Amino acid sequence: MSTYDEIEIEDMTFEPENQMFTYPCPCGDRFQIYLDDMFEGEKVAVCPSCSLMIDVVFDKEDLAEYYEEAGIHPPEPIAAAA
């Protein structure tokens, strides 16, 4: 599977009300990926309007702050890397 680009999680916009990260797509829409999907290992954000996809660069430990911002708990405890 080929992706359009590789984007750091810090460069994406987090929408706490949807628990979703977005990033502008060249088609005018936005790439989307859900926080829980990322927690489960998904690293590809998809644009709902075209066929483009991007790789999202993050560490699982990075997600804790976004769960806190959304006011929810992660599906399981996030352990710091040893």
From Swiss-Prot:
It is found in: Cytoplasm; Nucleus. Changing E8A: Little or no effect on interaction with ATS1/KTI13. It comes from the Eukaryota. It catalyses: [3Fe-4S](1+)-[protein] + Fe(2+)-[Dph3] = [3Fe-4S](0)-[protein] + Fe(3+)-[Dph3]; 2 [3Fe-4S](0)-[protein] + 2 Fe(2+)-[Dph3] + NADH = 2 [4Fe-4S](1+)-[protein] + 2 [Dph3] + NAD(+) + H(+). Its main location: cytoplasm. Pathway: Protein modification; peptidyl-diphthamide biosynthesis. Residues 3-59 form the DPH-type MB domain. Residues 66-82 are annotated as: Required for interaction with the elongator complex. Component of the 2-(3-amino-3-carboxypropyl)histidine synthase complex composed of DPH1, DPH2, KTI11/DPH3 and a NADH-dependent reductase, predominantly CBR1. Interacts with DPH1. Interacts with DPH2. Interacts with CBR1. Interacts with elongation factor 2. Interacts with ATS1/KTI13; the interaction is direct. Interacts with the 40S ribosomal protein RPS7A. Interacts with the 40S ribosomal protein RPS19A. Interacts with the elongator complex subunit IKI3/ELP1. Interacts with the elongator complex subunit ELP2. Interacts with the elongator complex subunit ELP3. Present with 8400 molecules/cell in log phase SD medium. This is Diphthamide biosynthesis protein 3. The lineage of its organism: Eukaryota, Fungi, Dikarya, Ascomycota, Saccharomycotina. The gene is KTI11.
